[in-house]
Amino acid sequence: MATPCIQNAFRRKTLPVRIGDLFVGSEHSIKIQSMTTTATTDVDGTVRQICALQEWGCDIVRVTVQGLREVHACEHIKDRLIQQNISIPLVADIHFFPQAAIHVVDCVDKVRINPGNYVDKRNMFTGKIYSDEQYAHSLEHLMNKFSPLVEKCKRLGKAMRIGVNHGSLSERVTQRYGNTIEGMVYSALEYAEVCVAMDYHDVIFSMKSSNPKVMVAAYRSLAYELDQREWSYPLHLGVTEAGSGTAGIVKSAVGIGTLLSEGLGDTIRCSLTGSPINEIPICIDLLKQTTELSERWGEADNPFAIHSSKQLGTRNTLNTPPWGNVYGLLINLTDVQLLTAEPIELLQCLGIDTTTGKIDPTTPEGVVVPKAMRSSPIVSEIEKHLLVFNKEDVPILNPMNEEEWLSEETLSAPFVYFEVTDIHTARRFFSLRQHSTQPVCLSFSLDPHLSKNEAIIDLSARLGALLLDGLGSCVLLDFVDIKLSRTLGFLILQSANIRSVTVEYVSCPGCGRTLFDLLAVSQRIRERTQHLPGGLKIAVMGCIVNGPGEMADADFGYVGSKPGMIDLYVKHKCVKSCIPIENAEEELVQLLKEHGVWKEPE
């Protein structure tokens, strides 16, 4: 299955789906969704959190339903919300227990199921091979087990989300398609076919992954396959287990922002570790920033044009030492910054230890300075550690001047800067120059009036969308906050799977199944391991329901198995189980040592 990418976009046309008192779809505003972190059986606490989420701007709220106790709790939660005149739709999250879905649909507005575990067994990597006959029999079994829920949802007018998660595909699907984007898409389509056959259409789809590159490719592919079949169902967007803090916001904005800018997505969630309340302002800012980007689309001559990313041209790295084939980061320094900054402070902002000369992993490869400042003492000091480019020596291409893009003067330069004002103009630039091997440095300026979160989201959405398609050779960032610029630059490169300079953390946002304080444990593990080399991925997951699957590409996993107990994973394999939580962090360090990735902090 080809992985498509989208060059021009309006919002993808979808059917309207009713969820309680609101509608989701292309003719309606994009809705914000979150999930409670309270135990669903804690009715009072769950209702309080739902009310708080609505006050902050959440449109749809989901609760976990593990079994019949949670089904009964949902009845009380819904009654309490009605009594308080709170109309926010209530969604039940189902894994492994179809009977819970059948019962809870009576009292909720929507049911979310995971095709990877609703009927089939989750893949346990046993190596089982399915014959064509066995595969066909499994599909018949799926129809028999899934159709009662479809029939009841249709009869009661309730909605459903078919939510596929990368890494938690069924054994049957993984055996045939692998743990791949193709497997994710076909997992969703198998369930979609049952819904279509039963003339049930109040369906929303999601294709989540903790890896934004996988997530974006999966949504693009599913949208293409659905539209080829004229199944115009809405999409719920999210980067699952995005983590916490700035890194979590960047991951979410790279994935969700890219798709929103392409016209995909009807509901969104930023799955950040910690209180779900913290997700809502980020979602609001993300919708605001991507709406402003979409207003600059102009008239797209081929709306929702899906094509191979190869049509846009391939990325050529700027082959200047010390880069080689490394995707580089440059920071623009203005004459004001160079004239007014304290030299030591400026070097430290760039990641250079002025005492030892040591370079931080997130130090940019170089800086761009005004030619008139090249001989200044501060630039001479910077040049001892980093590459220095004169701003006037390299063409800066105007995004509005297409003639300039292909001029002889432009094409004869060793490389060029292209100022990225919007995603679609940049894609057109690369499409017109697809036969050129000239390296292009993507130049981004950030509005100094943006708040920190707005700046993070704006840059992540604009830059991430291009990096995910392999466009550009390096990045030039121009922002008054130099330290924030380099931090964001490398986080976005890491989120786009282009370059990894620090440890990456995958951590779930928490829900009613969570067995420990996710935020506190995640922060402690980060503090103990953040000095380790880039390229390492560590997952911290609240429970074993989704944990082992959703940390699909993590190297090491810390997963709650039962109250007070932790399982440790290497890749998909549980290697240490039922460790008392007070010992688990030390056991994780020991596991890192056993696998040769640990080093003592300096």
UniProtKB/Swiss-Prot annotation:
A biological-process GO annotation: terpenoid biosynthetic process
Pathway, per record: Isoprenoid biosynthesis; isopentenyl diphosphate biosynthesis via DXP pathway; isopentenyl diphosphate from 1-deoxy-D-xylulose 5-phosphate: step 5/6
Sequence positions that bind [4Fe-4S] cluster: 508, 511, 543, 550
Enzyme class: oxidoreductase
Pfam families: GcpE
One example GO MF annotation: 4 iron, 4 sulfur cluster binding
E.C. numbers: 1.17.7.3
Record keywords: 4Fe-4S, Iron, Iron-sulfur, Isoprene biosynthesis, Metal-binding, Oxidoreductase
Cofactor(s) needed: [4Fe-4S] cluster
NCBIfam families: ispG_gcpE, PRK00694.1
Record-stated family: Belongs to the IspG family.
Role noted for this protein: Converts 2C-methyl-D-erythritol 2,4-cyclodiphosphate (ME-2,4cPP) into 1-hydroxy-2-methyl-2-(E)-butenyl 4-diphosphate.
Protein name listed in UniProt: 4-hydroxy-3-methylbut-2-en-1-yl diphosphate synthase (flavodoxin)
Lineage: Bacteria, Pseudomonadati, Chlamydiota, Chlamydiia, Chlamydiales
